[in-house]
Curated annotation (Swiss-Prot):
Pathway: Carbohydrate metabolism; tricarboxylic acid cycle; succinate from succinyl-CoA (ligase route): step 1/1. Keywords: ATP-binding, Ligase, Magnesium, Metal-binding, Nucleotide-binding, Tricarboxylic acid cycle. Mg(2+) binds at N199, D213. Belongs to the succinate/malate CoA ligase beta subunit family. One of its GO terms (molecular function) is magnesium ion binding. Transmembrane segments: none annotated. Substrate binds at N264, G321, I322, V323. Succinyl-CoA synthetase functions in the citric acid cycle (TCA), coupling the hydrolysis of succinyl-CoA to the synthesis of either ATP or GTP and thus represents the only step of substrate-level phosphorylation in the TCA. The beta subunit provides nucleotide specificity of the enzyme and binds the substrate succinate, while the binding sites for coenzyme A and phosphate are found in the alpha subunit. This is Succinate--CoA ligase [ADP-forming] subunit beta. ATP binds at K46, G53, R54, G55, E100, R103. Binds 1 Mg(2+) ion per subunit. One of its GO terms (biological process) is succinyl-CoA metabolic process.
Amino acid sequence: MNLHEYQAKALLRAAGIKTPRGIIIKNSVEAKEAAQQLGGNRWVVKAQIHSGGRGKAGGIKTAQTLDEVHHISAAMLGSRLKTEQSSADGLPINEVLIEEECRAIATYYLALTLDRPRQQIVFIASMAGGTEIETVAETNPEAIIYAGVNPAIGFSPYLSARVGGALQLDKSYQLPLTKLMNRLYQLFIDNDLTLLELNPLIITEDHEFLPLDAKISIDDNALFRHQELVDLRDTTQEDHRETQAQELQLNYVPLDGTIGCIANGAGLAMATMDIIKLYGGEPANFLDVGGDATSERVKQAFKLILTSSRIKSILVNIFGGIVRCDLIADGIIQAAKEIDLKIPVIVRLQGNNVDLGRKMLDECPLNLQAADDLIDAAQKAIAAAQ
């Protein structure tokens, strides 16, 4: 689950980390009042969406008058912002953050994330602050510093010494950096985060560390113990199909292809996508109905996939271990009848009650085809999508 910038900064402040003063608004009428309340003569108007690259896309603008604050806010609110990291349709701007402008004497990148290959939490830092870290990793990878946290020890000052040295910080900043990194680490652990990114992290004219932007992602599997964070969820920023899939307990990720995929088990779902790619097709989604799939869940999976207008065929790949193939076949048939399915569905069944399941599909008058094996299924699905 992702948070908006203003929500992430609220968590930072609660952890004792200073952030720029700002006020969130939901309509442009509030814009001037917010700027007046902040004071000063320059403000930053920031669209709140769950995507990086807002600045390049025009989602972060500086205003020098109260009228400018109002006009920029009015133009943003209610519109959609498309960035390099968002979908083609962009994301709706329902809220705008008005912040005081802060001047920097130095700019950095600092983040905490999970390093799965190393099986540890890792600090990532760079002197190339304010730019997308993915771009830095591609063009200048030696500019990125990694400092892994030993899970048996937790945060230790040597980590900040290593990061401070790599960032060529003056020794006077070492203690503030240690305090900052320690608080970030505790925030990361206490809230089961998967990403905590400060970009840019600046040193102000008052010689203080200050995050101008903050991004936080929370482990969905840990949300059951963080109801206060669940309440911050903004479903308008999420693909409605993914939200619906979560409610149905389906693991779903939309893609750009034309062949819908349904499988039971994440590994089998990935193998199904791989075999489609291998034979020249393009999967339209990842969809795992789970090892204990029921006919009802399969029916809901069909409905979910068909919300995409790009789908030209569907490949169902089921291994009947715990689940019976005849129950899956029944779910497919019921879904096809209820939805009035017009596109070809290729079904590969293997395992428990497979013969009965295939028999049910063969006897069904609808546009359902049983496949002998996964290769046969992939080739039929690709041919049907042509």
